[in-house]
Curated annotation (Swiss-Prot):
This is Uncharacterized protein TP_1030. Residues 53-123 are annotated as: Disordered. Residues 58-71 have a biased composition (Low complexity).
Length: 165
C-alpha cells in the first residue's frame, strides 16, 4: 500500500454507467472522491448500509441509499465505508415541469431554486462541483451543464438546498 501515498486511502469501484470507473476514497479527515470519468452520474447510493452516517444527515432518503457528501461531513464518525458505490443515470424526463414537481426522485429538489442557484454559481453539476471543491473534499472533472440539469442528482441538490436555506 506504499504506492498510494497516504495511510487511509483505498481504491473503490463504481458500478453503473457505460463501464465501471475507478474512484479513490481517502479515509483521512475528509473523504476524497476522485472520478476518472466525466461526471455525468445521477443518483448516487451506497452498496451497503451506513447507519452511523445516514442517521446524522437529517432526512435520510431510502435505507439503501445514502449520499456521499453527508459522509464527507461526518467522516470522523464513520469508521468504515462500503466497498462499492452505485452511480445510476436516470433517463431525462420528457417534460421539464415534471422535474419541478419531483415525482420520480423522493425529495429531489432539482428545480426548486433554478434562478438563484444557476445565476450565482453556474448551474447544474458545476454548481455542486464548485461548492464542494471550495470545501476541499471533492475532486472531479467539470460536469456538462445540460446533462447535469437533465438528471436528478438527489444528494447534490439536497446539499445545495440545505446550503441555500
Amino acid at each position: 500500500m506504499r504506492g498510494l501515498g497516504h495511510e487511509g486511502e483505498r481504491d473503490f469501484q463504481i458500478i453503473g454507467g457505460a463501464k465501471p470507473v475507478r474512484v479513490l476514497v481517502r479515509l483521512h479527515r475528509r473523504v476524497l472522491f476522485k472520478l476518472n470519468a466525466p461526471l455525468q452520474l445521477g443518483v448516487t447510493s451506497y452498496c451497503g448500509a451506513m447507519p452511523s452516517c445516514s442517521e446524522k444527515t437529517g432526512s435520510a432518503p431510502n435505507p439503501g441509499s445514502s449520499a456521499p457528501a453527508p459522509a464527507q461531513k461526518k467522516t470522523a464518525r464513520c469508521s468504515s465505508l462500503p466497498t462499492h458505490f452505485i452511480f445510476t443515470t436516470p433517463p431525462p424526463p420528457p417534460v421539464s415541469s415534471t422535474l419541478q414537481k419531483g415525482p420520480t426522485g423522493a425529495g429531489c429538489v432539482t428545480a426548486a431554486r433554478p434562478a438563484p442557484s444557476s445565476g450565482r454559481q453556474g448551474g447544474g453539476g458545476a454548481l455542486y462541483l464548485q461548492f464542494s471543491v471550495r470545501r476541499g473534499s471533492f475532486v472531479s472533472p467539470r460536469a456538462p451543464r445540460a446533462a447535469a440539469q437533465r438528471t436528478c442528482p438527489f444528494s447534490w441538490h439536497r446539499i445545495m438546498s440545505a446550503r441555500n436555506v
